[in-house]
Amino acid sequence: MERLATCACSELRVTCSGEPEKVSLCHCPACQKRTGSAFGIAAFFARENIRVEGASRSYERPSDSGFPVLLHFCPGCGSTVFWEPRRKPDMIAVGVGSFADPTFPAPSQAVYAEFRHPWVGEMASREGLPFGDQQG
């Protein structure tokens, strides 16, 4: 099975072969800032199962593990599509939102729970919350 992840303008594309080795939901402040959201979700694939097409720019940031993370984003639209965790040089992480696939496998772990926004998790089960197919 192949899955395609793209940036917002589709100029940066990542084709991933096979199933992800893990899918991780991360509440750390760095992922919150990277996504502009309350958390990030990454799918980790073996490096040899990844094919990148299109230009990317990169930004290296430190991580809590002491190993840097090299983030790759589209120079046109600015979307971060994938990153290289230097702690795991044989893996590439791809932002799950870049697949835009509601059937993508759910996270198998959640990390940095101490930074979790208290309302995360409540929203999915909240009665009376407006729910629609489009932004209103």
Please tell me what each predicted stretch does.
Residues 1-136:
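A short Gly-Trp-Pro
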